[in-house]
Amino acid sequence: MRLCRYSTPIAYNLSPLTYQVTISHNSNSMGIGYSNVQCYLTRHSNYMKGLVIKSIGTSYGVYFEDGTTADCHVKGNFRIRGIRSTNPVAIGDYVEVITNEDGTNWITELYDRKNYIIRRVTNLSYASHILAANVDMAALIVTINHPKTSTTFIDRFLATCEAYRVPACLIFNKIDLLNEEELQELASLRQLYESLDYPTYAISALRLQESELTKLFQNRITLLSGNSGVGKSTLLNAILGKDIARTGAISSAHHKGMHTTTFSEMYPIEGSGVQEERGSGGSGSWIIDTPGIKGFGLLDVEKEEIGHYFRDIFHFSHDCRYSNCLHTGEPGCAVYQAVAEGEIALSRYESYLSILDDTQERKYR
């Protein structure tokens, strides 16, 4: 039997495990509801339920309700059990672990996810990699320059979050390095995405102080993502109050960042209550650090559905003449007309077309 984590308070008396689940619904500064799950586990025999907080190759670091962690592995037949991804187990997954007599730990079951977010596998465009599961919020770190984050990358990230039901926000970093023209570009981008109800923040991670951004990470599991070199590691260190992640330089030749994070890991935020809650199984505040990302994509999505994951395009699509309109110049296309009249940003429409091209070529199928 699987553990239900999304209904009203419920208790299970199971053998060999006993679970008690308490669900509390909260709101946050973004206006997004989320569930803060507290699970109490009674250890029995050599089975235990845990939370995956680290992933290195085929090895997973699992955090248990009693505050201990262990290195765990996945059995081969588990990896191909209907999971279309290079990694069937991801950061943020709740798993069941069995310890053998020789002391090795094996993940034997993956509990249902409330959501997850994927990226494209480099040089293997038809495959996906799950960045994290059970995420309360995904934050994309964006830079106007040093290096430049493209609007296509931003829109692919947001569309992916929409498709997999992950609330998202944008954090514009390195604003202290911007000139007047770049500051105007920053203001325009913030206005664009805030008009679509995506929260945006403008910061300098090197000068990060107590602010609404700090509160953004409280009482939730947050995924930090972005291109290499956008200052993700610097921001992570500032939030955690210590040097956890290595920071890197920008390539002078290509103006791109060099990878400093090589694997995904989840960190507790000190002072958020997570330390006190660990013993009782509370979720507290966590940040998931991921390696620099080069591309996002949609998996198992029909081309007619892509517009559903662009809030502006979806809004105007209701007025299209044909229900299966792809918004590429069909007669009576309200989206195409909205782009021509400036009601949909051209950059957003071009991002939509790029994903549509990928889907038609079955790159993510």
Briefly describe each language-model feature range.
Residues Q38-E162:
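C-terminal effector/interaction modules appended to NTPase cores
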Residues Y47, T58, R84-E101, D112-L131, ...:
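Helix-rich effector regions associated with P-loop NTPase G domains
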Residues V135-V142, R165-I175, D197-A202:
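Conserved beta-strand/loop subsegment of P-loop NTPase cores
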Residues L177-V230:
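Canonical P-loop GTPase G-domain recognition
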